[in-house]
């Protein structure tokens, strides 16, 4: 079989769709700083509030403010609105080909009308824009292997042209690449391997499109930009490790799912220099720890070197005694 690479249309890399933060979101981020300060000062118990809860709320607010404030109005300049515009434009442009698209979102799964869901809202707005309801599907609705196979076949054949799902449910094993023309990251996952799994659905053999589009939606002044920046940093370190770069002595835990107080405060400032400083401070702290470990090991090695002459002398005496004993062994006869 001939190997054919699937390429990005937008200059060989994902396209960033930047969305401005609303005044309500900016104010909410400031409350996250106050919560982080209370946690750092010990004013609240871990079961009452913690950095993981703050990080989750920050990510939800960056995705859609209605996830943290259900009574808030729809943001016409937000990520959902931007995604609707991009998905609809590509849907129109690829009608003759019956091109399909994937939308990834981990933070807000379908609720079945019980409470606000980004999935339900996005689907309703896509329908309102003119996309037939039968051409939109949630991967969550396919609960059995047979249902998944039926759904995936519909995507490959172009009968379902917009499929929404999470990394866990639409990652490994989702073979729908035949007509995929675009992929949309509505939120950022935590691990580089999750980004790889998402984009691996479209950048793979069997896709009839020679060029595809990948979108990353980012709300400015929110947790989004820092999340993607962190993902790229982690991915770079992992790539260096996999290549056997001997200059890499340690790698932070890629599973960590909470930002620090300093990172939250830096994000709230909205100043890129402050955000950069938070990253530099974290790097300095990590290097300081590594230096302390190296210094302690060096002291231990120097102490060991100081004891080696005495150990050698003692062992040489033992060897001499063993040799003296060996020379005097008398053969035993039965």
Predicted regions and their residues:
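Conserved strand-helix element at the start of the C-terminal RecA-like helicase core
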Residues: 43-54, 96-120
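Inter-lobe coupling linker of SF2 helicases/translocases
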Residues: 1-73, 88-92, 214-289
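C-terminal accessory regions of helicase/translocase ATPases
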Residues: 88, 125, 261-334
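A short beta-strand element within the Helicase C-terminal
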Residues: 175-188, 212-216
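Conserved SF2 helicase motif VI
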Residues: 191-209, 231
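Conserved helicase ATPase core of P-loop NTP-dependent helicases/translocases
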Residues: 123, 132-167
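Conserved nucleotide-binding/hydrolysis micro-motifs of P-loop NTPases
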Residues: 22-25, 108-110, 143-144, 169-171, ...
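Conserved helicase motor "Helicase C" RecA-like lobe of SF1/SF2 P-loop NTPases
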Residues: 107-140
């Amino acid at each position: 079989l001939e190997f054919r690479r699937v390429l990005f249309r937008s200059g060989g890399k994902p396209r960033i769709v930047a969305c401005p933060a609303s005044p309500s979101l900016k104010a909410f981020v400031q409350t996250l700083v106050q919560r982080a300060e209370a946690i750092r000062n010990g004013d609240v118990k871990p079961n009452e509030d913690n950095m993981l809860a703050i990080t989750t709320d920050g990510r939800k607010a960056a995705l859609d403010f209605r996830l943290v404030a259900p009574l808030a109005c729809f943001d016409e300049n937000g990520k959902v609105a931007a995604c609707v515009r991009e998905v609809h434009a590509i849907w129109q442009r690829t009608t003759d080909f019956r091109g399909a698209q994937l939308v990834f979102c981990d933070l807000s799964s379908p609720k079945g009308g019980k409470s606000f869901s980004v999935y339900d809202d996005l689907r309703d707005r896509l329908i309102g824009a003119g996309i037939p309801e039968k051409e939109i599907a949630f991967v969550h609705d396919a609960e059995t292997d047979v249902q998944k196979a039926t759904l995936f076949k519909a995507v490959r054949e172009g009968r379902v042209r917009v499929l929404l799902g999470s990394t866990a449910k639409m990652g490994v094993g989702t073979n729908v690449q035949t007509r995929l023309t675009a992929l949309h990251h509505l939120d950022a996952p935590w691990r580089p391997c999750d980004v790889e799994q998402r984009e691996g659905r479209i950048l793979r053999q069997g896709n009839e499109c020679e060029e595809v589009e990948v979108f990353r939606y980012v709300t400015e002044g929110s947790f989004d930009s820092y999340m993607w920046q962190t993902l790229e940093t982690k991915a770079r370190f992992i790539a260096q490790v996999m290549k056997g770069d001997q200059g890499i002595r340690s790698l932070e835990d890629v599973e960590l799912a909470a930002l620090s107080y300093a990172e939250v405060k830096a994000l709230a400032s909205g100043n890129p220099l402050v955000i950069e400083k938070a990253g530099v401070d974290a790097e300095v702290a990590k290097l300081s720890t590594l230096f302390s470990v190296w210094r302690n090991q060096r002291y231990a090695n120097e102490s060991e070197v100081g004891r080696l002459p005495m150990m050698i002398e003692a062992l040489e005496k033992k060897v001499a005694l063993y040799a003296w004993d060996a020379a005097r062994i008398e053969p035993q006869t039965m």
